[in-house]
Design a protein with these regions (language model features):
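Transmembrane beta-strands of outer-membrane beta-barrel pores
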Residues: 171-175, 201-205, 259-263, 361, ...
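Outer-membrane beta-barrel domain signature, strongest for Gram-negative TonB-dependent receptors
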Residues: 228, 234-417, 425
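Outer-membrane beta-barrel translocator/receptor signature
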Residues: 106-108, 120, 129-138, 143-239, ...
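Structural signature of Gram-negative outer-membrane beta-barrels, strongest in the C-terminal barrel
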Residues: 244-248, 408-409, 420-424, 454-574
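Outer-membrane beta-barrel channels and translocator barrels
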Residues: 65, 190-192, 202, 246-250, ...
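Transmembrane beta-strands of outer-membrane beta-barrel proteins
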Residues: 167-169, 195-199, 253-255, 355, ...
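Solvent-exposed loop segments that connect transmembrane elements
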Residues: 207-230, 267-339, 383-392, 431-451, ...
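Acidic, small-polar-rich N-terminal luminal/periplasmic segments of exported/outer-membrane proteins
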Residues: 29-164, 573
Length: 574
């Protein structure tokens, strides 16, 4: 997949302002040693027998990274898979990925933010701001992190409230009318209560110039005049608030909330529109660029426009063009010719609340986290990418999830241990369809639209020990059992479409296909590894088993089906 990178920092102006404690922004070596929590405890990255790429907040700032997807440029063995010009993206770690980008499908690479799992694959693309560090763990991580981490995971840890007052503000101005502001402030609010408030806004102007006539395409009920809009713009806002409460000398309670809102234009690619030229007998004798057609129609016969827009002969092969007589734009410059170009077709909104309790008892540490997230997404695009907007794809999704984790940990002279319980609930409502007939490819007419609901409940118990066989040799063993229940309802409705730009799902009509099904699964993950320390080096070899829960497919035009769990066993030494 090719990602459009505008090198925002080329013309960037950055202002960093310390509200207090100038030492917070003192020059440091950004490649210093990093502490990670890959094994649910704070450890130096060089002491962990896992393939990890980690970034501190200072490193992220020095590299100019502003989005989670930009991490792949600096992480070996990690890439992105996706579609719609990069607007739907899934992490690929060591080749473990999937090609189902529907919002109800969870990815085999798990993504966490501050200990909270992101169930939606589309939530994996988010802006980076006020981040303490990011850890990318490669290989199965099912023992401690659970389901759907067969390929690995991306763990983002944000900056936390501080006792001393500190903060920063950054402003960036860059090419294509990009203006980005990021800032945070942290400090003590009252005795034993600390707060941190951070956020950012990014306004990105249109990168692609659309030479199609403004307003030439019909209106849409999504609220925008069609045609002519320049493309690949971005409007993102995000905010995070955290309150940290001291609970005596042994514990703390962290309450946090987050909100984000993103608006993007639709996928940028489309072939160059053409107009066919016919002689008096109706034979196609030429094809010209639509931009050179003064009559603004698909077909000109004997000098007269005989067909309006999108009504010409769909099959008119021409030298250098495709079967429909259209031409590839060749990707030269920043120009496109798109009739279906609306400025607000892709919207993503998310919000979340979390409460995290840490408490140190005399013989063990206790951790509890309650986490709620809500994710909404709307997508619209001309899916066929031809000169005529014949197959307008749209999807809408709402995902609500709640997770609860209880974890216990401790250590003695020869043993480190961690164990716990985990619960996850996900409710997904998802619809998708084509605003145009999938059989005749005519605008309007009958269309098939899919409407599905998926409810997931997952329960697990897990544990892992690190036992010192000698001063230099450690045996690591872990096991996780997961019970997962899924309830699925899917319907395909065929509706008479009166608007060729918007899908219309009428649930009062008879469903062409219905599937009501449930699936219960018993899953297990495991880890067995030996670690040997020599001087400042750590050598390890082991076996890891990860699982991704089975679920239900919901293709665009129906054909619902259950797919089995995925199992991955990895043998690794390093």
């Amino acid at each position: 997949m090719h990602t459009l990178n505008t090198h925002k920092r080329l013309l960037a102006l950055t202002v960093a302002m310390a509200l207090s404690t100038p030492a917070a922004f003192a020059a440091e070596n950004v490649w210093e040693s990093i502490e990670v929590t890959a094994q649910k405890r704070n450890e130096n990255i060089s002491d962990v027998g896992i393939a990890i790429t980690a970034f501190s907040g200072e490193q992220l700032e020095a590299l100019g990274l502003e989005s989670s997807t930009e991490l792949i440029a600096f992480t070996p063995g990690v890439s992105l898979a996706g579609d719609i010009g990069g607007q739907r993206a899934i992490f690929n770690i060591r080749g473990v990925v999937q090609n189902d980008y529907a919002d109800l499908a969870e990815a085999p690479v798990a993504v966490y933010v501050d200990g909270g799992y992101l169930a939606s694959t589309q939530a994996q693309t988010f802006g980076l701001f006020d981040v303490a560090r990011i850890e990318i763990l490669k290989g199965p991580q099912g023992t401690l992190f659970g389901r759907n981490a067969t390929g690995g995971l991306v763990n983002t840890i944000t900056a936390k409230p501080t006792a001393d007052t500190e903060g920063y503000a950054e402003f960036t101005a860059a090419r294509f009318e990009q203006y980005r502001f990021e800032g945070a402030i942290s400090g003590e609010i009252a005795d034993g209560i600390y707060g941190r408030f951070s956020g950012f806004t990014n306004q990105q102007g249109e990168i692609l110039e659309n030479i199609y006539e403004d307003g030439a395409a019909p209106d849409t009920r999504l609220g925008s005049v069609g045609g002519g809009e320049d493309g690949y713009n971005d409007d993102t806002k995000a905010f995070r608030a955290q309150l940290l409460f001291d609970i005596g000398e042994e514990g703390s309670l962290l309450l946090s909330g987050n909100w984000s809102d993103t608006t993007k234009s639709e996928g940028p690619y489309q072939v160059v529109n053409t107009t066919e030229i016919k002689d008096a007998d109706g034979n196609v004798i030429d094809v010209i660029y639509a931009a050179d057609d003064p009559l603004g129609c698909d077909t000109i016969q004997a000098g007269v426009c005989v067909d309006g827009n999108f009504n010409g002969d769909p099959f008119r092969p021409v030298q250098g063009g495709d079967f429909n007589g259209n031409f590839d734009p060749d990707g030269s410059g920043n120009k496109v010719n798109k009739d279906f170009a609306f400025d607000d077709q892709n919207k993503i909104k998310s919000k979340g609340l979390a409460a995290t309790l840490d408490y140190a008892f005399e013989s063990f540490d206790f951790f509890a986290m309650s986490d709620y997230k809500e994710f909404k997404r709307t997508v619209g695009l001309d899916s066929d990418q031809t000169a005529s907007p014949e197959l307008i794809f749209q999807s809408n999704s709402t995902i609500e999830q709640f997770s609860q984790e209880f974890r216990f940990s401790g250590e003695s002279a020869d043993l480190k241990w961690v164990g716990g319980l985990y619960y996850l609930s996900i409710d997904t409502d998802y619809s998708q369809g084509l605003a145009g007939s999938p059989t005749t490819f005519f605008l309007g007419g009958e269309e098939n639209n899919t409407l599905v609901s998926l409810e997931t409940e997952s329960y697990s118990v897990f544990g892992q020990i690190d036992y010192s066989l000698s001063d230099d040799l450690v045996l690591v063993g872990g096991l996780r059992y997961t019970r997962e229940d899924k309830d699925f309802v899917g319907n395909v409705y065929q509706n008479e479409n009166t608007n060729d730009r918007v899908i219309e799902i009428d649930t009062t009509t008879t469903s062409l296909e219905t599937l009501v099904d449930s699936n219960d699964q018993n899953l297990w993950s495991a880890k067995l590894q030996l670690e040997y320390s020599v001087g400042n080096s750590l050598y390890y070899a082991g076996i890891n088993r990860g699982v991704k829960a089975g679920s239900f497919n919901a293709p665009l035009q129906g054909g619902f089906s259950l797919y089995e769990p995925e199992e991955l066993t990895a043998y690794e030494a390093g």
